[in-house]
Amino acid sequence: NNKIMAKTAFKGTPVTLAGEFVKVETPAPEFTLVKGDLSNYTLKDGKGKYLVLNIFPSMDTGVCATSVRKFNQLAANRPNVTVLAISKDLPFAQGRFCTTEGIANVVPLSDYRYTSDFAQKYGVLMTDGPLAGLLARSVVVINPEGKVVYTELVPEITQEPNYEAALKAVE
């Protein structure tokens, strides 16, 4: 296996990711994540719309919370766009956060149930460092035909993603 492992950093310290970060112009890998009502959400559930996958370690950190709020605003007037907020947080915690923050335009999804199936397929599972086992901060945009059209693996986990670039991908 000579695939190049993706890297990110946490407070300047390099962090290795499992697998290969998903690439632009490739079919989006199938995934199953868990919704707030504990039912499954799959790639097929988002078919026909642009999917903006906002991927991050936990909603309970400042930068992650900010990214969810900003993507919530960006999705407000775009009926052809579904924003998925994806973390390892339990659906209960995700639901509490979204209710407290008035987040209505984002679908919170958890990767807790299927042994990081999503994280492995998309190449966003951190394998070392203090956040090992959590998802690396990244953004993936999938077009209505199911093709990856934009990706960003944020180089430093404590930084916010490039919202404008992600938004351009859905216009």
Please identify what each model-predicted range represents.
Residues 2-171:
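Chalcogenol-based redox active-site neighborhoods
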